Amino acid sequence: DATSGIFAMDMDYSKLDVITWSWQKVLGAEAAHGMIAISPRAVERLETHIPPWPIPKLFRLASKKKLIKGIFEGGTINTPSMICVEDVLDALKWVESVGGTKGSIKISSENLKICEDWIAKNENFKFMCEDKNLRSSTSITVLIKDEWFTKHDEEGQRGVLKKLFSLLEKEGVANDINGYPKAPPSIRI
């Protein structure tokens, strides 16, 4: 799953046999759709492996020991609306306008650096992922560590964050920055 990395981080594609990504994550386009890219090694495995159970049509990439080429030549598994397609085309034009993948990677890295600098100056916050080498530039998750917040139990913290996020959205500052539901109460940028 390259959703969090593609267009935002250097990826060694020679080591990746199958790559999937959504149009939403880094590109900011429609969330319901995505893409798949496969290597020649993956094609070989698809054409030689016979699964012991039936594969649902939606997930079938090979039939009768042959790659189903249509989906890699412009066919679709599930038809997206043309508005969604235009949305991702606009997103790709933006990537091209900022210097291609190198430009979008640079922007992603710079955004992470801005957050790192801000957190370094604000002792009330910390990254959920404390190891800088493992920290993602596309799913930056921040914890509030000040006592006014940590004195609440988890439910109370989530309530405080819900009010905060509502205010930020109302003021036009941020949208959809709530941490993942199974993560500790957090801010996800």
Model-predicted regions and their roles:
Residues 1-2, 19-22, 175-177:
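General beta-strand structural signal in soluble alpha/beta enzymes
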Residues 1-13:
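Catalytic PLP-binding core of fold-type I/II PLP enzymes
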Residues 12-24, 34:
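Conserved active-site segment immediately N-terminal to the catalytic lysine
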Residues 14-15, 29-31, 135, 184:
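Short, solvent-exposed loop/turn segments at the edges of secondary structure
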Residues 24-116:
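Active-site C-terminal subdomain of aminotransferase-like
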Residues 120, 124-188:
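Conserved C-terminal alpha-helix-loop-beta "cap" of PLP-dependent enzymes
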